[in-house]
Amino acid sequence: IQYAIPGVGERLLARRRLVTPPGQLVAETLALCSPHPERIPPGMVEAAIALIGARADALGVDRAYLQAARSLLRFAAGRGRYYGLMRALPMPVLMLHGEADRLVPVQSARAAAARCPHWMFETFPEVGHIPMMEIPEVVDDRIATWTKLNF
């Protein structure tokens, strides 16, 4: 919640970036996002470290992170409106969700899918918030199948 507070979140992220090496930032983030960060392909980890080390626009990255944190609070405050917007989406939707996601509980994903039965929805055991990094071959297969069915 502290990251969602305007001004506080920006300062916290700036301080963290100053005192934490890129490799540690990536390791901590992956440990938060995945129950099995060791399964993430080493090339993806190396690319993430290089990106953090080379990024010139940290404000843009921080802004995206803070917007996500703040949107969770807005969602919690206005679920009915949010679900209505989801149901109104005119295009096909594929939602893949890790059952071990610590950031967005699988119960929330299941609730969204129940309200939108026209969506294609699948969960994966022992997968967290980043299935595209944790099980990239499976995600690639699901996207390919979904694309063939919908386009």
Residue ranges of each PLM-predicted region?
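Acidic catalytic loop of the alpha/beta-hydrolase fold
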Residues: 75-76, 100-104
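Short beta-strand/loop motif that positions the catalytic acidic residue
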Residues: 88-89, 95-97, 101
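Flexible "cap/lid" loop of the alpha/beta hydrolase fold
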Residues: 1-16
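Active-site helix-initiating loop/hinge in glycosyltransferases
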Residues: 98, 105, 134-135
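Short alpha-helix in the alpha/beta-hydrolase fold that links the catalytic acid
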Residues: 45, 81-83, 105-114
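Conserved alpha/beta-hydrolase catalytic His-Asp/Glu region
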Residues: 17-88
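Catalytic active-site module of serine/aspartate enzymes centered on a nucleophile-bearing elbow/loop
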Residues: 110, 115-151
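Active-site acidic short loop of glycosyltransferases
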Residues: 90-91, 118
